[in-house]
Each structure stands twice: as structure tokens, then as C-alpha cells.
């Protein structure tokens, strides 16, 4: 296990608790933390699971059971769920001449980029990497940025635009990865869309971040900030819980050349300007080592000698957590792929964080797996996408890129696919007869208690005080049971109480009793309509344009 090197790296530093997060977690004075680089693959430490807050605030968002943070005691079984692929995938593919490379490679899929729902325009919007052989002819493999839109997230069109040659290309810079962020908290309309483009630097052909702004996601201004040179597969995310922009950068360690480093700043322009490659043995003021692959990563069955790596890592706020999307590389190396005419194996895995830095991974099975069937759109090299998931009714829409096995060029033929999951449906706690779950001490300022649950038998909720004593009027016997109901938003009431407003200001515990039921989440809302005040990731139809789950008219 990594040891936090406060005293070694910052002499005289004390770990006085300073910043307190929305959920009660205290951050140490040294932030982001500086860990020593390990010599072997290992899991990232998650300090807040070892030392929880005395009282956890549940004011923000639906509370998910993706880790043990909320749980004091339970006999329930944790079940990990994965999404179902849309039967008509891919939803977007390379069908234009201007999406080919000079050697005919086909590309039409995000490489992080972004898929968002814009509540103001009431459209699904996608930015993606396209082959740029008709413009950048100096190399076999060059790329620029295309744009597509949809009314339902399943049927996409590529509009004719006035940017480049009456196509759907919105940025012509020679690029690799990119992050397009629809910043719903941005007050300056000109900066509502942010592009963090990993572009070729003309002078020495190295990669660097260039930050650009747009008011509509189509017409982009000139760059306003640039980084030093970087490794290609780097990305950016916004952590709204702490109001910081974080750079997730490829980084080499003794464990793997596919590890990650981290940089954060409240100003996206400064974040980009501080980014650069790290020289070994010299500490950097802003950039810290982040994590390596885990020793639990799956290995390629055909190439078991290949040590897995983290090809990319994206993240986004969903409800009360930061959702981490890992593109886990399992090999083989490019030279072997080219010789065999196959795609490298990248699959998408999930992790969850409550402080935006330490991510817990409850499963090392793919969340979105490749399909090594001839003709499959996702035979190999699946990559995560920014903005994902989108909230569409009771479902979450997860998009990813995939690459088809082909005879044109081994690394080409990218397209975009969709998979759907129940809202909050990452993890459920399942109970048969006599099942229960007792939370840690909670504080709240809402009024109405809701659950997301699939109840084939029954579910009761009891409210207890901080000492574990059931509160009169809120006992299990007084609870109106939920029976044979499957809802992503179910109000909990008691015989004499329609809400728990009378308990505001008290420290409470919740005890859930399950009989043949699964519970995915609970939350306490100010509104009887059940909005959670959590973050809605890439957004969705009927949601608030603020990116926060509040009544749409607020």
C-alpha cells in the first residue's frame, strides 16, 4: 500500500484538517496528496473509507451504495450491474469522405471528446475524432474534430456547417485526444463550451493541450492557453463539488508507462498552462503522481504476459459522487497488432470517488466489454467519453467508442455505440428474508425521503437516533411498506408522517429492511417531486439546465 509522504516531500508539514467537503470528508492540508510512486501494481488508497466522518451530510444528491462509506452494518449482498448494449449499434459511424485518413482509415467516434445533452437547445450533442486525410496530408494518420446532434440520443445527424468546406467539421487542428466540456455552471456565455484539445505543436510535432472557448460548441475561438509538451492520451474533467478543473495525464512509472498524473486548478486556463511532462526525480509544484494500474486488472487471454495499463481516465460528477471511467489496456503493443491485423484490447471499467482524487473500484470486470465477433463495431479498443452518462428518464445512457477489425488499417474503423443502465443502477444491495442495512450517522436539511428500489417482496425504512434507538413515529412498524414495486424514485412515508422535516437538525441513522428486494440509492429532497440536488452528469431531457437535479423551472 502506498504511504502518504507528507513529511518526506514537504518538510515540517502537519496534516491539519482544512477543507471540509459537502459530505463531511476532511481534506488534509497537503492537497492534492503526494504519494510515493510504487514499485508494483496496486490499488489506489481510499482514506475516507478507512476513517469516515463522524457525521455524513446527505444534502447533495442521491446516495449510492457503490462503496462502504454510508454503511455501518448490513447483511445484504452487493450486486454489481453492467449496462445493456443498444441492439442497433453503432449509433454513429464513418460514412463521409472527409472522415478518412490519407490511407483510407475510417474514424467517427469520440476519443474522450464529449457527448452532452444541452437543455437550453433541447438536443443531444456529440464531438468526435474524424480522419483528416483530406486536409492534413503530411502523415498517414491525422485527425480533426467533427460534430453531430440528435433528438433522442439514438439517431444522429451530421449537420452541414459553415466552418470548413460545408462539412460537419468544427475544428481543423491536427489532434489526438480532446475534451469538450459543456460547462453548465459557467456564467460567461462565450465560455459555456470548453475544448481542451491535444494538438500537434507545429514547431516540433509534440503534443500539447490548447484551451478554446465557444458559445455554441460549433464556432470556436482561438486558443487562450497552452500547455508544455504532453503524452498524447490525456484528458480533463471538472469537479463541481470542489470547483476545480483536473487534468488526467498519461504518466510513466516503474510499474507502467500507462499510469496517470494529476493537476488541479480553479482556473481552467491556469490548469492548462501548468501542464507538462514530468522529469523523473524532480518534484513539480502543481503536478503529482496519481495512480498505476491495479494488480487486479484483467489480462488479455491471448497475451497473458502483457502487463495491463491505464490507457485513459475520464471522470464526471454523478449525483453525490465522482464517477471514474477507466480505459484499461490489455495489449498487445502496436507493433504486434499491426503484424497480426488486430485491435489492441481496451475495455471500460468504473470507479467512484467522494473527494475527486481517491477512486474506489468495487469490480474488476468490464463495465463495457469488447465483442470479439467478426463484424462487431466494438471488436477492440473501446474508449470512454466525456459527458457520459446522460440521464434519460429512468435510464442512464453510456456511450463509448469501439473499433472494428478491418483490412484497411489495423488501428482504424472507429464508431460510436450506446449502452443503457437503470438510473443509479451501478450497484444494488440485495436482501432476501431478514435483510437489513444500517447507515452511518447522517445529517440532512431536506424533507422527503426517497429510495430507488426494485421490490419484489417488501421494503421498510426505520429512522433511528445517533445511538441507534428507533424514533417514535418513524419505526419499522409505523412505516408504510413498499411492496412489489420497481421505481427509480419512491417516496417513503409512515402512518403519522409524510416526511421527516420534524427531524431536521438531528443526527439520524436509517435502517432499511429488505425482503426479496434491491435498493440502489436513497436521498432526502426539499421537494415532494423528489429532485435530489445532485449533479446530472451530461444532462438529459426535462432536467435543469444548471446541471443540478432541481425543479426545471428553478
Residue ranges and their predicted role:
Residues 17-311, 316-379, 393, 399-554:
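Beta-rich carbohydrate-recognition and catalytic domains
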Residues 388-389:
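Charged, amphipathic alpha-helical scaffolding segments
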Residues 2-12:
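Bacterial N-terminal signal peptides
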Residues 1-2, 255:
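Accessible peptide chain termini
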